[in-house]
A protein has these predicted regions:
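Beta-rich, blade/repeat-based domains predominating
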Residues: 48-62, 99-115, 147-163, 194-211, ...
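Structural signal for beta-propeller blades
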Residues: 73-75, 127-129, 172-174, 221-223, ...
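Short loop/turn segments immediately following the C-termini of beta-strands
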Residues: 70, 80, 123-124, 169, ...
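Short loop/turn segments immediately following beta-strands, especially the blade-tip
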Residues: 32, 79-87, 131-138, 176-184, ...
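Bacterial N-terminal signal peptides
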Residues: 10-19
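Residue position within the beta-strands of beta-propeller blades
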Residues: 67, 120-121, 166, 215, ...
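A short beta-strand motif characteristic of beta-propeller blades
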Residues: 41-47, 91-100, 141-146, 187-194, ...
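Short, conserved, GDST-rich strand-edge loop motifs in beta-rich repeat architectures
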Residues: 217-245
């Protein structure tokens, strides 16, 4: 969901900074001072030393919950019953990180209880899906890698179809692979086209009971771009289509949908209160859909069969909830719980499945002490200085 800098802007800013560095070196040389270089300690820095949660998944069979950490580039696993004692940091059971893992700007995460595998997709940079065993720790190599389209975000699995579905932001697509696909492998099918209603898709669920796929859309429709790169879906047209800014939505498709398939249902409109919907989860037993509503710090719950401009049947929001820029959401129907991962404050929250209103979470998992500031870094790629306001500008 982060704002992305344009390549030209990044190159321009990079050129400006390089010029400033060269000019500074020349000034130092003229003054007789030795040239700057080497292992220089910065005068000051803005950084976040703590993990920041993005995606989240829960496995009630093996009592595991896992989160993707977009800041320290890791995957973290906890006991499902873990809690932050006395407001302190919750120690994970395992944390996979390091160059061998291929974990980078990681987004959606998925747990496979049967095979005890943790799957995650890298979003803006690595363009891969990483598969690790549950017991992976430290700088562990993945058991398999799959090349996926650039800006993959959400991840869902169908045990009936033995397939994996991945949302792709910039391609306005859902790409579907064999569950055990690896290396560079074409998708089995995809959902994409002007009738599909996908617009900057993020969260996704696959409901095997009703054979449906649901997708959360920000509404930023970029058009069907031509340049798709390796491993991406074909466009079906030689010319890019014009983009549009659409209202956010949740679109639901048949689990067998492919190509330019129309949604079976669409939740969209002012009454829905959708605002930058991120993670999406379904409760097939209670016929409900839950979404992490990042734009207004809430969790919205809709009827599974909702259609059109409809209000949520429940909303979790308010100061007591601790919801702060929610990114991921997971439903544990076995234990009757909703899990929410916060991007805004180094925490994951657990609520009762039927929670509503301004209610406190049952449990909290923390990667930093309460009240620790969060700079909010996602994927900064450039920097500029506003000399008039004396401010540093960072496209995130």
């Amino acid at each position: 969901m982060m704002l992305r800098s344009r390549t030209g802007v990044a190159l321009l800013l990079g050129g400006i900074l390089a010029f400033v560095a060269v000019y500074a070196q020349e000034k130092r040389a003229a003054s007789g001072s030795p040239p700057a270089g080497g292992d220089i300690i910065p005068l000051r820095q803005v950084s976040d030393p703590y993990p920041v949660f993005n995606g989240i998944a829960v496995d009630p069979v093996n009592n595991v919950v896992a989160m993707s950490d977009v800041n320290r580039k890791s995957l973290m696993s906890y006991s499902r019953s873990a809690v932050s004692s006395s407001g302190g940091i919750t120690t994970p059971q395992r944390q996979a990180f390091g160059p061998l893992t291929n974990i980078g700007f990681v987004a959606g995460v998925l747990l496979d209880p049967q095979r005890k595998e943790l799957l995650a997709v890298n979003n803006d940079i690595e363009d891969t899906m990483v598969v690790l065993p549950y017991d992976a720790q430290g700088n562990a190599a993945p058991s398999r890698l799959l090349s996926v389209p650039h800006q993959a975000w959400g991840l869902a699995m169908s045990r009936t179809h033995d397939q994996i579905a991945i949302t792709v932001e910039i391609q306005e697509a859902v790409v579907i692979y064999k569950r055990d696909a690896k290396n560079v492998e074409a998708p089995m099918r995809y959902i994409r086209g002007p009738n599909a209603g996908l617009a900057d898709p993020h969260g996704i669920f696959w409901d095997d009971r009703h054979n449906e796929i649901g997708v959360a859309n920000h509404g930023n429709f970029r058009g069907l771009v031509k340049n798709v790169g390796g491993g991406c879906v074909p466009t079906g047209t030689a010319e890019p289509e014009s983009g549009a800014v659409l209202p956010p939505s949740i679109t639901v498709y048949s689990g067998d949908a492919k190509g330019d398939a129309k949604p079976l249902r669409t939740i969209q409109g002012e009454k829905t209160k959708l605002d930058f919907p991120m993670g999406l989860a379904e409760d097939a037993e209670h016929d409900e859909i839950a979404v992490a509503n990042n734009g207004d710090n809430s969790v919205l719950v809709f009827s599974r069969t909702a259609q059109g401009d409809v209000a949520p049947i429940r909303t979790i929001a308010g100061a007591k909830t601790g919801i702060n820029r929610p990114m991921g959401i997971a439903l544990d129907t076995t234990n009757g719980e909703i899990w929410v991962s916060n991007f805004g404050d180094h925490a994951a929250l657990v609520f009762d499945r039927s929670a509503s209103g301004d209610v406190a979470p049952k449990r909290v998992i923390r990667t930093a002490p309460p009240g620790t500031p969060s700079p909010g870094f996602g994927n900064p790629q450039a920097v500029a200085y506003d000399s008039k306001r004396e401010q540093i500008l960072v496209p995130n």
